[in-house]
UniProtKB/Swiss-Prot annotation:
Residues 8-20 have a biased composition (Basic and acidic residues). PANTHER family: PROTEIN IWS1 HOMOLOG (PTHR46010:SF1). Signal peptide: none annotated. Residues 290-367 form the TFIIS N-terminal domain. Residues 1-195, 379-406 are annotated as: Disordered. Residues 386-395 have a biased composition (Gly residues). It is found in: Nucleus. Keywords: Nucleus, Transcription, Transcription regulation. It comes from the Eukaryota. This is Transcription factor IWS1.
Amino acid sequence: MSSPALDTIHDQTGEQDLHQEVQAQEHLPVEPTPEVQEEPESDHQDDDEQPEAQVLEQEQEQVAEQERLQDQEDQDQGAELVSQQPTAEEQEETRDELYNEVFGNQGSEASDLSDDEDVRMDEGEKYVPATATSAAKIPKFKKSKRDDEDEDEDEDEDEDDGGERRRKKKKRAERRRQRQEEEDEDEAPVLDEATQRRLALEERIDAIGKKPKAIRRKKKGDDDVDIVDSYHDDICARLRDRMIAAADKDEAANRIKMPGTAKLAMLDEVMGVLRNTTLWQSIVDNGVLEAVKRWLEPLPDKSLPSVGIQKAIFEVLPKMDLDTTTLKECRLGPIVLFYTKTKRVTPAINRQADALVQAWSRPIIKRPANYRSRYIESQNEVEQSQGGGGTGGGYSQSQRGPGERKFKRFDVKKALEENAHRKGARLQIVQDVQYTVAPEPKTHHHAEEMQHVSRIQQDNKKFNRFARQVKTKKH
């Protein structure tokens, strides 16, 4: 147990120790602590403006230094140019050379062009270049007279010099054009890719709107052969040989009971050439149609070629304008006629072959190709021609001679009188009839008997109209 006296002693000793520590700290050297003091706003602004002013001064010094260096470089270059400046003699020689290039000198091409006059400079006169105070002095040109002998010689040499002058003039024009093109290329601005593409597109659009230039074919001769025609002929000749070889391969494969695929393999290539309209004349000239006939012919076992081959060829043949002479040479008519008669082809191919036969046969039988002017015989005209002994040959009544017997047409009234005693009605027998001639239209049948009926109907219409008008007036 602690007494109050002991507590008092401990408190006193603690206070003494604390007092001694404070005194010891006071005798130690005091270190200054950084104190943050508030400064007025004007001081801060001065501190900010001071570095900005320093930066501006540095920039001005740099600019002045650069200008000084540039002036020094200009002075050095000027001194070099002065040292390299040509002398007066060199300038005079350069001007003389330029003058000779522009106006020509002795021995140049331009000096050979004068026939009736000789141009020369006066002796003692020279070209004086222009100066700061005086203009350039150009020498005078005078016409010198020739002797009569020289004139006679020139007249004899006119014909020989004419061709040479034209050649030299053409060469000079060509060189002038080349120089102009080079100058245009140098002066042309550099364009980016987008601008170049746009200009190219505009040029193509303008070219489409313009009319194409007529291409004149060269006349074929010993030394002058049209390259395009010869190229087309080579293509068609090679194609004909390959088509015949493919047909031979398929026939050989058919004989050994194997499928023939040679023609199918090159069908696309053949159709690409046959559809090209620019090659049609070469196709006819080089016998490609004979190879087409080989492709359409039946195989040794009497089988027909592939349906794809038939369809492709019969689609392109009507587009080719083949005349009678060409059809005789290529022998394509008999095979097309065979496709109109056989029943082993599709109806579409049969119709196409029939249309080809009709189109190719019109020039032979002297029939026009225009359907509007085409003439069709009627049944009445056929009967009349038969009744006249077959001499009419399909002529109309107006074209018949006066001595020919006129065939009497079917009399309806007489037929009704003959069948009047018959009782009952007979059923109509419907038959599938294929007409070889055009039947008589029903509108013209019994036309004479129906004329009075039409007159009565017209009179009735007039009377009804008149009756209506009278009624309206009464009301």
